[in-house]
Each structure stands twice: as structure tokens, then as C-alpha cells.
UniProtKB/Swiss-Prot annotation:
Residues 1-13 have a biased composition (Basic and acidic residues). Signal peptide: none annotated. This is Protein inturned. The modification Phosphoserine is found at S674, S678. Residues 1-54, 129-150, 707-752 are annotated as: Disordered. It comes from Rattus norvegicus (Rat). It is found in: Cytoplasm; Cell surface; Cytoplasm, Cytoskeleton, Cilium basal body; Cytoplasm, Cytoskeleton, Microtubule organizing center, Centrosome, Centriole. The gene is Intu. Residues 33-48 have a biased composition (Low complexity). Residues 138-150 have a biased composition (Polar residues).
Amino acid sequence: MADPARRDPRGRAPELPGDLSSQEEEEEESDSDAGASSLGSCSSASSDTDLEPEWLDSVQRNGELFYLELSEDEEESLLPETQTVNHVNHVRFSEKEVIIEEDDSRERKKYEPKLRRFTKILKSKSLLPKRHHKKKSSNTGPVSILKHQSTQRTGVTVQQRYKDVTVYINPKKLTAIKAREQAKLLEVLVGVIHQTKWSWKRSGKQADGERLVVHGLVPGGSAMKSGQVLVGDVLVAVNDVDVTSENIERVLSCIPGPMQVKLTFENAYAVKKETAQPKKKKAQSSTNDLVKLLCGSEADATQHSTLSIPHITMYLTLQLQSEVAREEQEMLYHYPVSEASQKLKSVRGIFLTLCDMLESVTGTQVTSSSLHVNGKQIHVAYLKESDKLLLIGLPAEEVPLPQLRNMTEDVAQTLKFMYGSLDSAFCQVENTPRLDHFFSLFFERALRPGKLHLSASPSAQQYDAASAVLLDNLPGVRWLLLPQELKVELDTALSDLEAADFQELSEDYYDMRRLYTILGSSLFYKGYMVCSHLPKDDVVEIAAYCRQYCLLPLAAQQRIGQLIIWREVFPQHHLQPATDSDPEAFQEPEGRYFLLIVGLRHYMLCVLLEAGGCASKATGNPGPDCIYVDQARATLHQLEGVESRIEEQLAATPGPCLSCADWFLAAPREKADSLTTSPILGRLQGPSKTAASPTCRRTFFSDYSFKARKPSPSRIGGGREPGEGEENVGLSPHTTPDTVRKQRESEGSDDNVALLKLARKKSTLPNPFHLGTSKKELSEKELEVYNMMKLTSGPENTLFHYVALETVQGIFITPTHEEVAQLGGSVHSQLIKNFHRCCLTIRAVFQQTLKVEKKKALSDGDHLESANSVSSLSPVKEHGVLFECSPENWTDQKKTPPVMSYWVVGRLFLNPKPQELYVCFHDSVSEIAIEMAFRLFFGLTL
């Protein structure tokens, strides 16, 4: 371990030399690198006895910090198999000498501890070397488990599996115990107590020996004095010679005299039982890739894997700086550098011409264009600000055009949040590496979404990949409904943190103005927001930042040991100039804003702080303050007992009950009769009554008024009343008439049987699909709970999926992964994919509607009157699509595959506040979207 003040240019501590027997007492000049020592402010670390936080050395020169430390189990799974073998020198003994054989096949990697908590203690005890021999560039010092290359990324630190500890060993101690029985050299010289297993003694295993696990430390011994050896560590090498219980005594006996000896230990958390079997290797590999990508160590590999896919982002200027033509002078930034992107880069003049010419001719800005490259259609989205143009191009088969437009707007929003403006982001050369990392993550999410969505079950993984088309670009964050008593506990914990009126956070503690004012915080659990005390604009910007940097899937998939992110941000809501001329209106103070993100296990706490105003003004590039980090981490530790209750809520499906689409497969002749009597089509004026084609059919219908609708007819699509035929067919509490028909036609399936068995395990509600005769057996309270949980009316639950967006609060509600995982089936999985892609198209229509409404409101002189009149004339907008589907891989050639029809309906509410609802339900439903929206949004509060 080395003093943080003496570091190489990359911020790493030099390695300890192997032999320090001839220590020199001269003090070297301390290079006080302005990086770590001055960037992180630790108010409590004023005395020499205080310990530095482990993340302090990771603070960058601009004050930013990204520190990731996975939990013990996650880090162990991320270690490559090649590192589990001790690549050290081997030793064999002859009668008179020790022969050390170097392992030429594999080079020994030096491991060095990452945590530097005991730096000052070791220095005060003169246990640190006074002279460091710098290695060549090929020897990179400590090797991160996330990086297998020579160049380390500044600001990213993770725990190591191995650590080197230098201790002073004096063989003369043996003379003091000469009269006694022969003692173990490991205890006398090193101060480590190791107890051989009873099974080894009994069986007489002496071939290779057992691992030297530290079971205890001798008081006053060299190991205890070092302060780095812990109980549970495993001694694997002495001066790069691998040791076991069989040869440790002979290796130590070869030490000629008093000297410094390097001991290599395997950290206690990395010790794993020998009988443990490797599990989920594929998942671990994907998780490893996710963490590598997040830390920026896989940018080259990511670019290499997508070289053949045309994709690009460019930031161009429409105003040339000089009259002399210069190659690529209009290009301020582009990524990536590949042959496929080079073709898009070479035609950038077309994009500039379209942007300039169409705007001058039509008076409107161009939003997108399409072209073919290597036989593939490429969509290009435009975003123009003043005389600059941001272009993002992606293949049409990977990213639909509406999604690309939303992604481009999200990129611009996030970059403004991080750098203040697009010019500040792209026009500063020092930001180029950060932008490369940003867009490597962006294109990875766009081109390979499955790599970032790693879940325990394949159905949940498919759900993540399918829903990302819509959910990743909504102006909000996924919200988890919680019971009131649990919500109160979370609110109380965040309120205590935000009050900042205790101990070091209080102004009276140091008799000085506090460094920052906590404006608010948001708490996430497994990617769901469970509590928030931030306004909507801040929530949307912080959630977009977390999505772009894959923080939400990271917390959902892995147990984080510690995550600390600190950076200056520019929230547009606080920095935009005030439009109100009233002098008494609230004015935002002229301050600076910082984002602190602290992660622990599956929790992630985002805190927005303000410097200036009531707090002290920030100067330079301040790093994270230890006190605020510790208090945020203490808040997460305080919520340890709540974690199990949140897990129960996730498993209890807090939202409306859902049904599986595979349960509704009907015979084709029965389906043909019900098409002409569809409740939804019956309410439309002049619906199309053409015969349905065998393939998937979609019927678009325009907006219609709620007041003009006729009373909803009774359910027709079921074909029979509840309870009919119950004497001949034994209906279980979890079957329906549609299910019985399906089983009679297709002889049943193992998937449905397994699904019905899974549904029986949910004892909180009888069955969200159909009650049948069991409805009579329910108590009045159980029936009331069931009706509250069922979003649709009627005897059967016909709701397949839903997404409710609350734009005022910046949240959306959708079924949890656990709910979707319980509804298996090939038809239902295809339904989920169609639903999100269809909703993406419907929402694009809604966005155009909002733009038109906004222009109408602004064109009138009286803004308020116009807005109110528009809202009263068009309170809602609705759009929907009718799908027909059949099971895939239908093998029975004699029978026609069953057909199921379902609606995907979106509804836009403008009054009293903007809301969007997207639902997917069976064609037989007699519900209307406004009724379902009222049930879903009623009582929804943060």
C-alpha cells in the first residue's frame, strides 16, 4: 500500500518491491498530485488519525467521481476463471537447497489492495517503503477485475481478489523458543494461526497440502501489525512462491535473516468453498459485460462487435469559421470510427443541405430522413439548435423511426443536464473521451438491448427487451405501488436526510455555512422508483441520466457493494430564466447544482444538491464531501429492514390483475361469429365488416367522442354465461370457458397446466381471470378486493397489459417483472412485443396532437383563454389497433389453428392534467378506456 500523495500519472499506487531488507531512511519528495488529495473534501478528516474514504483516490481532476464496488458474490462471479489459479512460481526442495522454478507459461500478475483506509496508520508505523521503483508501462500495477488491459480508466475503481502485504520477519525469534517444543514457523515468524482440518489429519492428505486460511492472528505479530491481514484471508504465496500447508514451513525456514517479505493473500470475501459448483455461467458472462460496459473498459470490444452495422452520431455546424475550405471543418464530433459509419459520414453534406433547404422552403425543421447503406435502410434523426445540428443514424430493422426520434431527444436532454448545453458538450476537446463512452453505451442499448437486460427468468428478460422500445423513452420513471405504511417509512427516511439538521450537516456544528443545500432526493429499488421528493422536471432528467448510463438495470440485476457517483449537473428547470415579471415571484438563486448517487445492494439513492443561495458558494471543481456521502449511505443502511417488505410487494403484484392471452384462444368458427358483434366495433360509426384474413389483421379507427357512445352491450365473445356446462366439465377456480374450449380443441398443453398450477399458489386473490362457481364461495371482503384489483368489468378479467403515464409527476405504472413472468405462453410473449411497438406508434400520434394544440394555444393573443378553450373542446384523444393472432408452430394439419383478437388502445387526457393510458385487452371486453383510466389513476400519489 502506498501513500496517495505518491502516485503515477494514472492515479495508481506503485507496486511494492519484493525485497526491502535494506531500507533507506531518506524521505523522498512528495509529489502532491492535485488530483485526489484536493478534490474530495472531507471535513471530518482533519486530524492525522482519521482514515481516508476508499473512494477518495478515484476522484478526477474535474471533481467527478464514479466509484463502483460490487457485493462479494457479484465480484466473485465476475472474476475470470484464469485468475482463480495462483499463477506464481513453484518451489521444489532438494536435500541442501531450494530450487525455485518460474512458470513461463503464464505471467504472474501483481495484485495490490484497492482500499487505502490504513494509509496514515501504516505510514506512522514506518511500514510503508520509502522508495518506490516505478515499473515499465507493460506492468500496470493493480489489475482491476473489470479491466484486462494495460490502460486503466481514470475514476473507476473496484475491489481486488488478491492483495500483497509486506511484513518484517526476523528468524532470530526462534532462539527464544528453542527450549520449548518446536512451534510452527507460520505463527512465530508471520503471526498467522492456521488450524489444519480434522479431515485432513485423519485421511493423511499430504500430496498438495491444503489452503492456508487465516484462522487467527498472534497478538503483536507481524501480520497484526500490518493491519491488512484479516481472519478468513488465504495465504497463497511468499515472495511469489506459492505455498500450502505442505511446504509453508520449509519455505519460511529458508529465510536467511531479518528482512521484509512480501506475502500474497486472497481476500476473505473472495474465498469460496471448493465444492461450490459454477452456476449461471452465461448470466455471469453477460453481467460481466454489463459492468465492463458501464465502467468504459469494453468500448473497443463493443465497437468491434458492431463494425458491420451502420450507425453514427455527428454534431455538425452550419456556419463555417473561415473562408478557406478545410476538410471536415463542419464536423465538430462523430462516433464511432468504422467502415460502416464512414459511409454515413461521407454523405453528411446531404443532411446539411436537407436541414437548411427544407427549413427555408417549408418553414419547418426537418426531423428525420431515411437512406439505404449496404442494402440496409438507415433512419437518421435531426435535432437543430441555433447553427448546430445533431444527427443520429441507426438501422431501421433495429430501431423504429418514432423510437429514434425519442432517443435523440433524450440524448440532447441528458447532455444538457450533464454539460449545460450541446455546445459545451461537443465543442470542448477534453469531453471527447467522455462522449465516446456515453455514445458507446447509447449504441449498445440500441443495437444489443438484450445484453443489458439480464434477468433470472427468460420471460423477464424478453419482457425487458420488448418493453425498452416504449418505456426507455417515456418522460418518467417506473413507479412501484407500495402500501401506505411502507411509503411513510421511506418518506420519513428521505425527509431526515433532506432536513440536514443533525451532527456535521448542521450549521451549528462547525459554526459556518453548510456546503450544500439538499433540494430533494429519489429512492430506487431494482430499477423502480419507490419514493421521491423531487419535482417532476428533476425526476425526469435524473432518470434519463440513470438510463443512459445503465444504472437502473445494474441495480436491478446485481447486489451493489457500494456505488458513488458525483458530478456537477445543470438542471434546466432551475437554470432557465424566469418568465414571470412579478418581483414578488420566486426567483431561483444563482448557484451550482451537483448530483450525488449512492448505491447499496439493490437500492439507489439520487440526491440533488445546491451550492449557493442558502449554502456556501462553490469554487473550482469541488469533489464529493465525505459527510454527505456517509449520510446518504447511512440512509440506505437504515432501510435494510424494509427491503424484504418491498420484495414481498413486488411478488404480490400490486397493480391490476392480468390474464394470459393463451387462455383466450377460441375456435375459428366461434371467432368468426363474434367478430361482427365486437363491443368495441359496435360503438364505432360504420365499422368495417369485411371478413377476417387468416393472418394478423389490424383495424385502425379514428378519434371518437365519449359522449356519443351507446350503452355498453353485454359480453358476447365468451359464447356462454358463467357457470354454463359446469355439470359436465369440472371447472377449477383457475379455468374459464375460453380455456375449456381451447383445451377441448387442442387437447391442452403442458405450459397451460404449469401456468394454472402457478396461479393456484397465489392465495391472496382467488384468480384474476375468472371466478366461476368459486365466486359464490368468496367472502364479501375478498370479493371487494378482487373487484378493486380487476381493471375491467364483467365476470372475466380480460386485461392483458397496460402502461399508465402520469406526466405531471413524471412516473409511469406498468406490470412488474414478476407479474409478466407468471403469464407464460408463446402468444402472450408476442402480444407483449406487439403492444409496446403499437403504443410507440400511437404515442407518436399523440405527440403530434400535443404540438398542434400548443401551436393553437400560442397563436391566440390571450394565452389562458385559448388553452382553456382548446382543452374544453378536445378533452381526450383516443387511438387503437385491433390484432388477430394464432399460435406459432401449429402442428395439427387437420384442424385450423385457433384465433384470438385483442385491442391495443391508447388514450390521451389533456384536462385536468396531461395523462396517457395504454391498455391491451381481449376483443370481447365492453370497457372503455376512460373508465379503466379512472380506476388506475384514482388515488395515485407520490
